[in-house]
Each structure stands twice: as C-alpha cells, then as structure tokens.
Amino acid sequence: MFKFQKEQEIANIAGIKVGGQPGELPTLLAGTIFYNKHEIVEDAAKGLFDRIAAEKLVNLQEVGSDMTGNPHMVHIFGTTQESITRYIDFIAEVSESPFLIDSPEGTVRAHASRYVSEIGLADRAVYNSINMSITTSEIEALAQSDIDSSIILGFNAMDSSLRGRMEMLETGAGLLEEGLLSIADRCGIVNKLIDPSITPMGNGAGIALRMTITAKAKWGYPTGSGIHNAPSAWNWLNRQKEKNPVLYKICDVGSTCLQQAAAGDFILYGPIEYAQYVFPMAAMSDIMIAEAVADLDIEPASRHPINLLV
C-alpha cells in the first residue's frame, strides 16, 4: 500500500467523515433504495411503497454499520418530483444518516435540492451528481440551495480514457465551458466526492480504479464509485445469473474490495439488500489496508473495523 504526498481532505457530512489517507477512515458505504423495479415500490411515479419493508432495509444497513464501524448513507433513487419528495420524507423519518438524492432526470434532482433546503435537511443531503449533462437550470437550482455536498462524476461520453475523465473534471474536456470542479465551486459545494464513473467491463471499467488513485493524488478529494455497476453490466456474468445466482452475487458484492484496494473512500454498493454481505466484506478490506499502512504513520480512526473487530 502507499501514502499520498498530497494532503488528503476529509469531508464531514452531517457528522459522517469520509476521505483521508488509505487506512485512516473506514470506507463509507451507501446502499440504494427505491431503485428501478425494486420490489418494495408499489408506484414509482407517485412514490408509493411498502413502508415496513423499506424500514427493515434501512435498519439492515444501520445494523451493518453499527457492527463494523463503516459509516453509511442511504442512496435514494426517484424518477419523479412526487416520488423523490416522499422518499426523502421517509428516510429522514426513519434514519439520521446522510442520504444521496439521485434521479435520471435533472429536473427531479433540482427539485430535490430545493426541497431539502426548504425542510432543513440540506446538511444531510449529497447531490448525485454534478456531471457532463448538467443543465443551466439545474446548476442554478443547486447554487440557490443549501446543499454543500455532491458527487462529481468523471464520465466523459466522448473520451472514456483516464485523460478524458480527468479533463472533464478540470477543464470540461472541450465539451463544457468549464470543468465540473469549477461548476461545483459555483454551486457552493464544499464536500466534493469524486466518482471516476464506472463503464462496462471491456469498455474501460478498470480505468475507474486507476483514476481513483490519480484523482486523490492530484486533488486530495474523497474518491469512490458505484463499482458494482461493472460486474452487473457484464454480459457473461448476466448469462450465468439464472443458473447460478450465487456466482452473480459474489462478483457483484466482491467488487467492493477492488475499489477499496485502489484507495477508494466511499462505495455506492447497489441494492440495499446486500448490506448484510457488503459491510463485513468492506470491514475485512479496511482492516487489511490499515495493517498494510501501519508503518506509514497513518493512525486508524477509533471506530475503524480494525479497532472493533480484531
């Protein structure tokens, strides 16, 4: 393992710390709820869902966090303004954790940024995400909100190389008038969480691991990804899924360790149902990484898995 020469920033999101040197803080884990075709969702447009089942899933993640010391966030996914409003209200009611607000629609994300500001929850909200498709109206909504934490996505549709992704953040890569980091500054984002973006395997998925190290070395911001999207989009693995679902789950969950070994600070691990597997696996990786840097003057946090589970 290694220690970055660049000073590493530690973001504080509603009391949850993320970032730092490898082995310093436990990995922040975020499971997704209300995702596409989630069986607990009864009406995705209206945001109707099985509240009892949803609370059990949130509790499952919190139990994993309490056991291992790995902090957690709830990754809220909504497709309409009505649905994401209901989802935010529910998560705020049953959990005190930070949460990500995510939608494929920029108008929904913009609405969510205004809504959490109106109800006093902006300090717990992480915007997902500032990316190359962000619109002027979305930038204005985010800038006018009280949100100060956001994922900044390094996806570059024209050039998925390491250079293309880094330039998207720094300069806009010739596709935007300014880099995404500059846009984040204009929006008042203090806690910048860099996501290299996960492309399919065979189309540069592994570049995200290299970019994690490169971005932390260059800027020092907390960096991580939804790395499970690589195996979940792997055609070969999907063909095995029906006859061997355990194999699929092992690869999906196991990808967590790859991001951690590449100095990742946070992981969007996918369906929140996987919390029971992800938290012990992430804790194992955190322990081994902490041991690997023990002679590099990196002191693990008091609630690091190495201090709770060893």
UniProtKB/Swiss-Prot annotation:
Keyword Transferase among record annotations: yes
Transmembrane segments: none
Gene Ontology molecular function terms on file: methyltransferase activity
Keywords assigned: Methyltransferase, Transferase
Pfam families given in the database record: MtrH
The UniProt record lists the keyword Metal-binding: no
Protein family: Belongs to the MtrH family.
Assembly information from the UniProt record: May be part of a complex composed of 3 subunits; MtxA, MtxH and MtxX.
UniProt-recorded name of the protein: Putative methyltransferase mtx subunit H
Biological source species: Methanosarcina acetivorans (strain ATCC 35395 / DSM 2834 / JCM 12185 / C2A)
